[in-house]
Amino acid sequence: MTTTEAPSALSFECETGNYHTFCPISCVAWLYQKIEDSFFLVIGTKTCGYFLQNAMGVMIFAEPRYAMAELEEGDISAQLNDYAELKRLCTQIKRDRNPSVIVWIGTCTTEIIKMDLEGLAPKLEAEIGIPIVVARANGLDYAFTQGEDTVLAAMAARCPEAATSEADQQERTNAIQRLLQFGKSPAAEQQPASSKHPPLILFGSVPDPVATQLTIELAKQGITVSGWLPAKRYTELPVIAEGSYAIGLNPFLSRTATTLMRRRKCKVIGAPFPIGPDGSRAWIEKICSVLEIEPQGLAEREAQVWDSIEDYRQLVEGKQVFFMGDNLWEISLARFLVRCGMRCPEIGIPYLDRRYLGAELAMLEATCQSMGVPLPRLVEKPDNYNQLQRIEALQPDLVITGMAHANPLEARGISTKWSVEFTFAQIHGFGNARAILELVTRPLRRNLALGTLGGSQWVSEAVTSR
């Protein structure tokens, strides 16, 4: 019998499996709502249309601000003129919806037939007078949430380098201040002026309540957010001047970070992501450190949040969680759950950018060591067959997985949680730590309830009889 020692450092593997994730064109689901004056045109086949219709559940009569440009046999065999067809569609969009920007979303089919969307867009943009942003979100090269990354990287190149005037810059700042002061009494508006520091851009799409919470948390430290990418309106894209600071909110935005560094000459701040009270504190502390501001009250704020989620921590303490890999949130979630007392033997992830995730990886390692649990094994592009064998051997208490594997695992008596739920939930910042544990513990609480009713015996008998 051989014994295996726990690794003293994070181990990285790549199994070169397929991308078993949601299609990245699903980014349209949240981006078209976030950018209120946009219109998304997905250029693909009927399969893409069926996916969007079913995944987003928006009925036709709701007139959503996205549409499908369905490729037909004539397009694939080059019998039709791509420019003429796209011009017809974009002219109709301009007439019916008049958006401030049209975003073309490329798919697998446009990649395979080598459709030159980047070449067609500038000519058509000049002709119809509406900006056209091209983003390739095909499932051949990108995982689920990386669709947002390609869109934001394309939009980063469109951000102005300088405000058109001092009055315009003041108006942008005042818009953020008005958002923070909405609903407050005049007396509450008297707050100390923020410290002078270089411009700070936050990039990553989050719901408006989360954006407000994070802006307020930074304002408490005397930090002013100069702009957001994406902005609520395309016409309000942030000014990105050379030397500006930028920091990401989501772990799947490595291409956007690279674009900001190389093309816009920004200084991208590397920090753990604001997931859980520990990550939120580290995220704010890193910003304060770079801007040379002394953080105030963060330790007390973190302790307060930990106390408020103690009931959920007791539920997960000592439990084992396994990440199969789907939405690139795996490392941040694993770090937070380990801090809550869970053990994580393996983290599968479709794509791993060690440079962009460097601070998060370092914090994961430090968290495991401080909690006295073995370091997880990180597997990039995992092979699902091999993963299933490891899950069968480990028998974890919970597997966080894509929807395709949830029911088969449940049929084998293994509790699961859909990773897609974390994508659409509000999970950033101090105030949403409880929401994460609410999602994670739901199957565990269900098992406890079944055990009380005697249902766990029925489940085990059903699994044994297979």
Curated annotation (Swiss-Prot):
Binds 1 [4Fe-4S] cluster per heterodimer. The cluster is bound at the heterodimer interface by residues from both subunits. It is an enzyme of class 1 (oxidoreductase). It comes from Synechococcus elongatus (strain ATCC 33912 / PCC 7942 / FACHB-805). Component of the dark-operative protochlorophyllide reductase (DPOR) that uses Mg-ATP and reduced ferredoxin to reduce ring D of protochlorophyllide (Pchlide) to form chlorophyllide a (Chlide). This reaction is light-independent. The NB-protein (ChlN-ChlB) is the catalytic component of the complex. It catalyses: chlorophyllide a + oxidized 2[4Fe-4S]-[ferredoxin] + 2 ADP + 2 phosphate = protochlorophyllide a + reduced 2[4Fe-4S]-[ferredoxin] + 2 ATP + 2 H2O. Protochlorophyllide reductase is composed of three subunits; ChlL, ChlN and ChlB. Forms a heterotetramer of two ChlB and two ChlN subunits. This is Light-independent protochlorophyllide reductase subunit N. Its EC number is 1.3.7.7. The lineage of its organism: Bacteria, Bacillati, Cyanobacteriota, Cyanophyceae, Synechococcales. The gene is chlN. Pfam families: Oxidored_nitro. Belongs to the BchN/ChlN family. It comes from the Bacteria. PANTHER family: LIGHT-INDEPENDENT PROTOCHLOROPHYLLIDE REDUCTASE SUBUNIT N. One of its GO terms (molecular function) is ATP binding. Its cofactor is [4Fe-4S] cluster. GO terms for biological process: light-independent chlorophyll biosynthetic process; photosynthesis, dark reaction. Keywords: 4Fe-4S, ATP-binding, Chlorophyll biosynthesis, Iron, Iron-sulfur, Metal-binding, Nucleotide-binding, Oxidoreductase, Photosynthesis. Pathway: Porphyrin-containing compound metabolism; chlorophyll biosynthesis (light-independent). [4Fe-4S] cluster binds at C23, C48, C108.
